[in-house]
């Protein structure tokens, strides 16, 4: 009976250890995925900021010349 208890205890202990290792690996994979998602979102926001600054610069230089021409044709 004592050897059965020891064997059962050993099986349970090894089971808990393997479950703990699997949970740790899964947690690490989830953290890696979140970091990758964050990096891709940061790259997307940088692209948007770059595009908006280019559009703003173009509008700043082109609109003063275009608005009077449009006003002439409409008026």
Curated annotation (Swiss-Prot):
Expressed by the skin parotoid and/or rostral glands. One of its GO terms (cellular component) is extracellular region. Keywords: Amidation, Amphibian defense peptide, Antibiotic, Antimicrobial, Antiviral defense, Cleavage on pair of basic residues, Immunity, Innate immunity, Secreted, Signal. GO terms for biological process: defense response to bacterium; defense response to virus; innate immune response. Residues 24-49 are annotated as: Disordered. Contains two amphipathic alpha helix regions separated by a region of less-defined helicity and greater flexibility. This is Caerin-1.1. Residues 23-49 form a propeptide. The modification Leucine amide is found at residue 74. Residues 1-22 form the signal peptide. Residues 30-45 have a biased composition (Acidic residues). It is found in: Secreted. The keyword Nucleus does not apply. The keyword Ribonucleoprotein does not apply. InterPro entries: Caerin_1, Frog_antimicrobial_propeptide, FSAP. The major product is Caerin-1.1; in addition, different peptides are produced that are missing some amino acid residues at the N-terminus or C-terminus. Caerin-1.1.1 and Caerin-1.1.4 are inactive. Its main location: secreted. Belongs to the frog skin active peptide (FSAP) family. Caerin subfamily.
